[in-house]
Amino acid sequence: MASRARSEPPLEHRFYGGAESHAGHSSLVLTLFVVMLMTCLEAAKLTVGFHAPWNISHPFSVQRLGAGLQIAVDKLNSEPVGPGNLSWEFTYTNATCNAKESLAAFIDQVQREHISVLIGPACPEAAEVIGLLASEWDIPLFDFVGQMTALEDHFWCDTCVTLVPPKQEIGTVLRESLQYLGWEYIGVFGGSSAGSSWGEVNELWKAVEDELQLHFTITARVRYSSGHSDLLQEGLRSMSSVARVIILICSSEDAKHILQAAEDLGLNSGEFVFLLLQQLEDSFWKEVLAEDKVTRFPKVYESVFLIAPSTYGGSAGDDDFRKQVYQRLRRPPFQSSISSEDQVSPYSAYLHDALLLYAQTVEEMMKAEKDFRDGRQLISTLRADQVTLQGITGPVLLDAQGKRHMDYSVYALQKSGNGSRFLPFLHYDSFQKVIRPWRDDLNASGPHGSHPEYKPDCGFHEDLCRTKPPTGAGMTASVTAVIPTVTLLVVASAAAITGLMLWRLRGKVQNHPGDTWWQIHYDSITLLPQHKPSHRGTPMSRCNVSNASTVKISADCGSFAKTHQDEELFYAPVGLYQGNHVALCYIGEEAEARIKKPTVLREVWLMCELKHENIVPFFGVCTEPPNICIVTQYCKKGSLKDVLRNSDHEMDWIFKLSFVYDIVNGMLFLHGSPLRSHGNLKPSNCLVDSHMQLKLAGFGLWEFKHGSTCRIYNQEATDHSELYWTAPELLRLRELPWSGTPQGDVYSFAILLRDLIHQQAHGPFEDLEAAPEEIISCIKDPRAPVPLRPSLLEDKGDERIVALVRACWAESPEQRPAFPSIKKTLREASPRGRVSILDSMMGKLEMYASHLEEVVEERTCQLVAEKRKVEKLLSTMLPSFVGEQLIAGKSVEPEHFESVTIFFSDIVGFTKLCSLSSPLQVVKLLNDLYSLFDHTIQTHDVYKVETIGDAYMVASGLPIRNGAQHADEIATMSLHLLSVTTNFQIGHMPEERLKLRIGLHTGPVVAGVVGITMPRYCLFGDTVNMASRMESSSLPLRIHVSQSTARALLVAGGYHLQKRGTISVKGKGEQTTFWLTGKDGFAVPLPEFTEEEAKVPEIL
């Protein structure tokens, strides 16, 4: 294989095919023949580029998964692909998760190795930049670990595909499963403990939360950063008081601890259920699945539902593949130090399938006589469903976006033979998007015949049950003795009490803002006399959303216009509520039943939470028939449609641009909120307040207003002129979602921006002599050679704005820019930045006010950047998990480590060197030397503890344990440091050479944070003292090793050790020690070792 960076063992492993040829004559014909033959042979060989980190502590280390690619290459070379009898090889580069180094390595692979495809990178730091360059160079890129989330849009990377299903997929499966099982209230519990290498919790948490929060009530969210059992129990205890259905988002190791904590808390009675999301981290659960005998496991496992791919758990073929990968990794060229099959990364299977999928695509294109070296054409072939593969990870089939979809199953612990196993009982079809029982004899009740209710019968706080009346023999006797008169009296009293209770309950509901503060008493609103309807309940006096085409009655509440006689025509009743002018949008009486639905209540709460200067404030809802209405802020200037209609002259561009900025800012906020989109953006839903600030309205509460989340397109009953702003892809749907889509909002914005540019109030197509239904029919016609759009004159606005409009109403939704890009274009088109309408009157003062928001945002970004700098600085002084706990104000408990290796070094003759140098020269010398050391140790799994003067202390095996790898890491690092020191030049003494002496020792230590002011992460124990003695008794330019470290290096293998003999060590007596002189395959120059220097000096 290609050469790799620094200390890794050489991977000289290439796979070639074809035959060698040579020229023995000088004739021109023979020379041309040889050139042609060599060209054909070169064409018959395909080189695969592979990027992954070497460091074994990384979850995607090549030492954990690289053999998966090697196995695939062997298969391809043993079973030739295509009519051209291709041969295959791969070249590996240690990406080190550094974007700059990875980019340089990729360029080198393309220019020197002539790679045909790149598999990787495995690090997100490098994925985006390499993906963009691969797309530019037309090189296929296969992402086998799901790190290309930034380039999932194939518009940016049209040569990229991803073998791992998107994380949103498992969120969709979870949503469908919860709906199928009838659970509505849930809690989310997850995180990553300090010792866990699982770093996907943030992305998976976001994907799950985005899917669930609009469909379910999330009663609690608990994030943890420590796996301590007491903290886990405390989190579970608080969550169990408000949730019975608990989603676990964590690694398998953490899940085991969480479930044990649940067992200790007694959450194993069957009233609680735990849904564990597992995409690949299956080592722990696979052990449970594979047991044939009765397994001893906590009772709480019976309440676990496992959501994982349908291929999950491993078939016999999967087990054989993992075993084969493990065996290959242990042998050259990888020579991995992993000690068991459990340490093999499950991503090795995706790596294997990535190459086979590429090879099969190459074969299909060769059969079709297409150029498989055309990366875009190759990816298009994949996305067109022309290539399928039955791989180790199951069926591999990509959609049109280059994303892979896998079927999922819901597993539960079920009886199997003499024991219990996790077996599937629900199956999710990723293409049909449906979930159904795994077998016909399983139903929604689950594998055990029943499942827990998502809440207690009386509620979590006993608030849904009345106190039961006392029972007993005495009461029975008294009841039987009651005479009819008393019975009548009791019934009358009961009726009176019930009426009183209902009256008080009604008052309670209205007076508790924590529960129903969005409910508004209709009597608390004072309707303005001139706008008060003649009688309540008449549709003509209301903003009736069910009849949006009625004269002067529209869905855009709070809008008015003036007639030519300056008579104000209000489009909705206006009133006073708590000192605010409010607009009332009346809803039909059938909405009374809808407000009780959980989905409607959830959306009401979302509307209450939306606070932005360009969003119409939502006050609440009146739920008292017949006056059911939505209450929002009243905007005095009406809608943008009214402003355009009533303007007697052409508005200034500053005037228009201010409105555009307000719309963009409002849409940016909405798209970032849980609502995700507006769905009805048009001039009549853009309201203008008394300060000439535009506010968006007309979104949300669709189910409450209309009784459904979709509207059915009806050719006869639809006012087609109201659809001019609706995107064509939505118009083609039979059921059009009220909420629309983000891309549809961009299209609506384009039409609206065009209305502003041309200042047209009667619709964007008023210059066309065609009926509205004909116009809509042309817009949604996908066969039209040129999509119908409104006229757009170039001289009406800035050319960049005109180009923006055309980009925003592109026929393909994927080609439309998002609102952040739109805002950036607006700033570029208006050099003065955002300018409000009143700027022309107030000059610089108003200009400052209009920029104030951007200044605050910039200062906030600077504050966040400075905060990140502080956090980054803290992370260089302390381990990351220690820094997080200190920032949170928590104490850090000391931790015991059973085995670590400690490195000490100092400079021989440093005191004399200091006497010959100025203090500034000494500081510069140490800074240059330690900067060199710091850069060198970055490639090793070590932790720099501290520096004191010329002493340098490093440890491996803490704060994150790495098994038996610590001695190997420290020894290799020591050889590197010794090598770079021999070439180090002292700035003010160029003729002098530093003489570094090093000591190593292996043993147990205790680590903890000491002090409050300038806290430090310190190590304690006899191991530290012994390592220091090894350094002080070492010789210049030598690595002195204790007997315990020597034993560890002999187990690791490949190191050159020379016995020094027995020496007297202060406080330890006679000790047998060794010199570390080299390592197999270590090509870096080291100082020569003489026997004279090995003589034992007098130890003080």
Swiss-Prot record:
InterPro entries: A/G_cyclase, A/G_cyclase_CS, ANF_lig-bd_rcpt, ANPR/GUC, Cyclic_nucleotide_synthase, Kinase-like_dom_sf, Nucleotide_cyclase, Peripla_BP_I. This is Guanylate cyclase 2G. PROSITE patterns: GUANYLATE_CYCLASE_1, GUANYLATE_CYCLASE_2, PROTEIN_KINASE_DOM. One of its GO terms (cellular component) is cytoplasm. Residues 44-481 are extracellular. N-glycosylated. One of its GO terms (biological process) is receptor guanylyl cyclase signaling pathway. It catalyses: GTP = 3',5'-cyclic GMP + diphosphate. Keywords: Cell membrane, cGMP biosynthesis, Cytoplasm, Glycoprotein, GTP-binding, Lyase, Membrane, Nucleotide-binding, Receptor, Signal, Transmembrane, Transmembrane helix. Residues 503-1100 are cytoplasmic. The lineage of its organism: Eukaryota, Metazoa, Chordata, Craniata, Vertebrata. Residues 549-826 form the Protein kinase domain. GO terms for molecular function: ATP binding; GTP binding; guanylate cyclase activity; peptide receptor activity; protein kinase activity. It is an enzyme of class 4 (lyase). Homooligomer. May interact with NPR1/GC-A. Residues 901-1031 form the Guanylate cyclase domain. Expressed in lung, kidney and skeletal muscle. Low levels in intestine. Residues 1-43 form the signal peptide. The chain crosses the membrane at residues 482-502. It comes from the Eukaryota.
